[in-house]
Amino acid sequence: MSQPLTVDCPTCGAPVEWDAKNAFRPFCSDRCKLIDLGAWAAEEHKIAGSQESEDELYSGDLEPRH
């Protein structure tokens, strides 16, 4: 039998076994999962991209305000 895949928890760095039985993967616990969610909600994490490209992408979908 092969060794189980182990990854580091993105929040605290603890080793986490990557297994379907682990409901929190890639996190080690519900607490670390919620800390990460809070960081996204507080905009501490962002996906790289320019604001201009987003504006161009959606500007035709909206009717002008009067």
From Swiss-Prot:
Co-factor binding details: Binds 1 zinc ion.
Family the UniProt entry places it in: Belongs to the DNA gyrase inhibitor YacG family.
Subunit structure: Interacts with GyrB.
Binding site for Zn(2+): C9, C12, C28, C32
Keyword Zinc among UniProt keywords: yes
Function field: Inhibits all the catalytic activities of DNA gyrase by preventing its interaction with DNA. Acts by binding directly to the C-terminal domain of GyrB, which probably disrupts DNA binding by the gyrase.
Protein name as catalogued: DNA gyrase inhibitor YacG
Family matches, as InterPro entries: DNA_gyrase_inhibitor_YacG, Znf_NHR/GATA
GO biological process: regulation of DNA-templated transcription
Alphabetical list of Gene3D superfamilies matching this protein: Erythroid Transcription Factor GATA-1, subunit A
Highest taxon, organism lineage: Bacteria
SUPFAM superfamilies for this protein: Glucocorticoid receptor-like (DNA-binding domain)
Alphabetic keyword roster: Metal-binding, Zinc
Entry cofactors: Zn(2+)
Origin species: Pseudomonas putida (strain W619)
MF (Gene Ontology): DNA topoisomerase type II (double strand cut, ATP-hydrolyzing) inhibitor activity; zinc ion binding
Keyword Zinc: yes
Signal peptide span: none
NCBIfam families to which the protein is assigned, alphabetical: PRK00418.1
Disordered: annotated segments: 45-66
